[in-house]
């Protein structure tokens, strides 16, 4: 009951018909993040794309300037010296066939998956498991690489993956409600900039169509897109 009252109060503070400048929107999101844990602040963007077409997929990685406040668990498929490099760099789980067996059995104890190029024949067999979870290593995203240490460091330092869903919407966490508003806004603008740079050549019309900010337990606040690109 208390949860419902809190949500109703938060929703009443938001004008759902209004497009808020990002500074106002962020202030509302932070003031409505009153759960007993440090809520994640999320940015949602509606893009003018049709992801059903291969040439209109939007996907990428960005290291947010102020981090995310979340520590990612990193899994690495590697052998020999590269496996040792991964362990030394702070990977949470490292392996080859043994790690593949764990994944096949449903034990996935990582949020980001990195692989050296020679491991992709093995990792490729796990595509039906890793793919739907957004965990499949991809050379375009820098997660199929010989620079294992660099990839792990990037993942652990606040790197965010963004990917358009079927409806052309991107959802991404940009930090915690405890962050200063200015830092959250800086992260949001950095994410929008990365998404703009990832605009597919096949996209027609307005690319950044709608934007909204929300916290884990709070209502969505519509944002004036132009205030995210200024």
UniProtKB/Swiss-Prot annotation:
Gene Ontology molecular functions: rRNA binding; structural constituent of ribosome; tRNA binding
Pfam (any one): Ribosomal_L1
GO process annotations (BP): regulation of translation; translation
Superkingdom, taxonomy of origin: Bacteria
GO cellular component terms given for this protein: cytosolic large ribosomal subunit
Keywords (A to Z) from UniProt: Repressor, Ribonucleoprotein, Ribosomal protein, RNA-binding, rRNA-binding, Translation regulation, tRNA-binding
Keyword tRNA-binding in annotation: yes
This protein's record includes keyword tRNA-binding: yes
CDD domains with a match to the protein in the record: Ribosomal_L1
Family note: Belongs to the universal ribosomal protein uL1 family.
HAMAP family registered for this protein in UniProt: Ribosomal_uL1_B (MF_01318_B)
Task of the protein: Binds directly to 23S rRNA. The L1 stalk is quite mobile in the ribosome, and is involved in E site tRNA release. Protein L1 is also a translational repressor protein, it controls the translation of the L11 operon by binding to its mRNA.
Summary of subunit composition and partner proteins: Part of the 50S ribosomal subunit.
Protein known as: Large ribosomal subunit protein uL1
Organism annotation: Acidiphilium cryptum (strain JF-5)
Lineage: Bacteria, Pseudomonadati, Pseudomonadota, Alphaproteobacteria, Acetobacterales
Gene name of the encoded protein: rplA
